[in-house]
Swiss-Prot record:
Residues annotated as binding beta-alanine: Q57
Protein task: Catalyzes the condensation of pantoate with beta-alanine in an ATP-dependent reaction via a pantoyl-adenylate intermediate.
Note: The reaction proceeds by a bi uni uni bi ping pong mechanism.
Family according to the record: Belongs to the pantothenate synthetase family.
Biological process terms in GO annotation: pantothenate biosynthetic process
Pathway listed: Cofactor biosynthesis; (R)-pantothenate biosynthesis; (R)-pantothenate from (R)-pantoate and beta-alanine: step 1/1
Subunit description: Homodimer.
Cited CDD domains: PanC (cd00560)
Active-site residues, Swiss-Prot/TrEMBL: H33
Taxonomic lineage: Bacteria, Pseudomonadati, Pseudomonadota, Betaproteobacteria, Burkholderiales
Keywords: ATP-binding, Cytoplasm, Ligase, Nucleotide-binding, Pantothenate biosynthesis
Protein name: Pantothenate synthetase
MF terms (GO), sorted A to Z: ATP binding; pantoate-beta-alanine ligase activity
């Protein structure tokens, strides 16, 4: 596996490749990330991964400086997955000049849910993904369903800019107790880690209620948030939305595929999760 930091060297290395499968990450790789590499291999060859902690998607009071950076361990894991190239640019490589041009998602998708609680987050995501796509020029790119809203925004951006890249969605990988794997799980204390699976369990309860015919979506959301709050969580949202556009469904939308999404703080750690219904 080649480890490359220069955009020009990356382009030189990939010249002539027309079936590249790309997996962008911020590093601190876990089994969830590695499952993306394996899925990428099913859709293209060679597999290219990137590791870049993107300052543009962190707010002023978020964890950019303490976000775990474990490059050497990540390299070992990617080598075992037979990744062809790891693109690991420095901030100077990616942004040699201030990134004055940004990609802003539409308000109705980018400023709701995660976008409401993390202003500017999806602008940072879209900008770096667009730049990475320009560098790698992949045939396919793999994104996880755990970041459901991000997946939808990236897919829509790719379509609207007519990028020659198919976006492949990967299922969320969970620990045996149901907790979705996340690089931020390492911030949890032992007590918090024992409590953390309640987020997925709460979503599962909402899912079962909807499947059983409960169409009072607003009450289901309120009750789920209250249940988490009673256990010491600080929920930002639990939202039942249409999968196609993340718009809140009406009670009469009987056939619309739905998803329930959540974000909540447990101690100092903010966790997100979702379940398709």
């Amino acid at each position: 596996m080649k480890v490359i930091s220069s955009i020009q060297e990356l382009r030189d290395q990939l010249r002539g490749q027309n079936r590249t499968a790309f997996v962008p990450t911020m590093g601190n790789l876990h089994e969830g990330h590695l499952s993306l590499m394996r899925l990428a291999r099913q859709h293209g060859d060679p597999v290219v991964a990137s590791i870049f902690v993107n300052r543009l998607q962190f707010g002023p009071n978020e964890d950019f400086d303490k976000y775990p950076r474990t490059l050497e361990a990540d390299i070992e894991k990617l080598q075992k997955e037979n990744v062809y190239v790891l693109f690991a640019p420095t901030e100077r490589d990616m942004y040699p000049q201030p990134q004055e041009y940004r990609v802003h998602p539409p308000h109705d998708l980018g400023d709701i849910l995660e976008g409401e609680f993390r202003p500017g987050f999806f602008t940072g995501v879209c900008t770096v993904v667009m730049k990475l796509m320009s560098c790698v020029q992949p045939r396919v790119a793999v994104f996880g369903k755990k970041d459901y809203q991000q997946l939808m925004i990236v897919r829509a951006m790719t379509e609207q800019f007519a990028l020659p890249t198919d976006i492949v969605a990967a299922e969320t990988v969970r620990d045996t107790d149901g907790l979705a794997l996340s690089s931020r799980n390492r911030y949890l204390t032992q007590t918090e880690r024992a409590e953390a699976p309640m987020l997925a369990a709460t979503l599962q309860g909402v899912r079962q209620a909807v499947l059983s015919g409960n169409r009072d979506f607003a009450k289901l959301e309120r009750d789920a948030m209250a249940s988490l709050a009673a256990r010491g969580w600080k929920p930002d949202y639990i939202a039942i939305r249409k999968r196609s556009n993340l718009i809140a469904p009406a009670a009469q939308d009987l056939d619309a595929p739905l998803v329930v999404l959540a974000a909540a703080k447990l101690g100092a750690t903010r966790l997100i999760d979702n379940l398709e219904i």
